Amino acid sequence: MKQARNFPAATITKKAENSLRLGHPWVYDAEVLNLEGEPENGSLVDVFSEKGSYLGTGFISYKSKIRIRLLSSNANETFGDEFFARRIQYALAYRRTVMGPTDYHCCRLVFGEADGLPGLTVDRYENILVSQVLSMGMERVKDTVYRQLVKQLAQEGVGIAGIFERNDVAIRELEGLDRGKGWYLADYLPQPPSPITGITENGIQYEVDVENGQKTGFFLDQKYNRQAVAKIAAGKKVLDCFTHTGSFALNAALGGADRVTAVDVSDTAIEMAKLNAERNGLIDKMDFIAADVFDLLPALCNKHADYDFVILDPPAFTKSRKAIKGAERGYKEINFRAMKLLPRGGYLATCSCSHFMDNELFIKMVQSAARDADVSLKLIEARRQSPDHPTLMNVPETDYLKFYLFQLV
């Protein structure tokens, strides 16, 4: 017998029940056995086991493979403004603690499921917030969440100049949501500012384009990994592949590298990287190449180009499990070429931002590339995304970024 609740009831499989009890907040479409009533797309439903035990309440999405995203397992919870105010309060308090006063001004404030706000990402660039809404349920309540963000940041003395929505990602279509981007307009927000803004990270100034830049404009998750690169760059000739707006390259240059070459296939990214180098007085020790890294690395190997530190920070080569074999080949190719380019004693920083390329598979790929390149690797550091992108240990999807720093021996 089901407990009386406030929302339409969804009964789920034993497998899904076990997953929820272990703390994973998703129920997939095939795991819903029965749905009472006709809840609106994106509305709240109560979730029950086959035996009628209440398991939680979450957003339902009829278009998505993730049919229900759990918000809370508290049977006494209400889901009005106070609920979302608490979630934002916890998220901001966590960032103030783990990022500290030097980095809180530019970090991820909300990381979806890891903050109990499924389908929502919010990044802060000084006084501009950039959001992505990736679930139908969050789309319905986003104004409540935005209002709380603006209100609570104002209480900290931070006046938000605008919220830019980067809802131009294909995953929204899987939720039945339109794609688009632009300033969010509301009576609690001023007239929108320019989408080009300035930030400072690790002592380096950047120009960030929140409208047209990759992701939300900048890769905040590599913040402390860039520090790791800067720490060992002194006196070295550095090749930064997939440089985007030059963040790893600039950290290497500021760290004392003799020479830094920044490579990206995008002419726009290269121009932005040059501007950032000029802004920081580092242009004289940097070179910039607009090229495909898969073509450039073999050419550099053939020329016996002189580098002793290579950085590989590619975009995600796969966004699905079924494409993982092709992605693995791509990762291995660039790592193999980098190892062939480097001398013994050289350094390699290599990354993957794909959740589907899990840590075990990534390490196996690196070891395979090392065998083929006839080198051994000494591990210096193994790192993850910065703590403003927290990993929930029972939600593996929140653990996505791998960063390894090796020396070739």
Predicted regions and their residues:
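Conserved SAM-binding motif I beta-strand of class I
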Residues: 259-264
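Conserved SAM-binding loop of SAM-dependent methyltransferases across substrates and taxa
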Residues: 245-258
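Conserved class I S-adenosyl-L-methionine
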Residues: 235-244
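Non-catalytic accessory regions of SAM-dependent methyltransferases
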Residues: 1-126
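Mobile active-site "lid"/loop adjacent to the S-adenosyl-L-methionine
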Residues: 307-337
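Non-catalytic substrate-recognition/targeting regions of SAM-dependent transferases
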Residues: 112-123, 143-218
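C-terminal catalytic and target-recognition region of SAM-dependent MTase-like enzymes
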Residues: 333, 347-409
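S-adenosyl-L-methionine
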Residues: 268-309
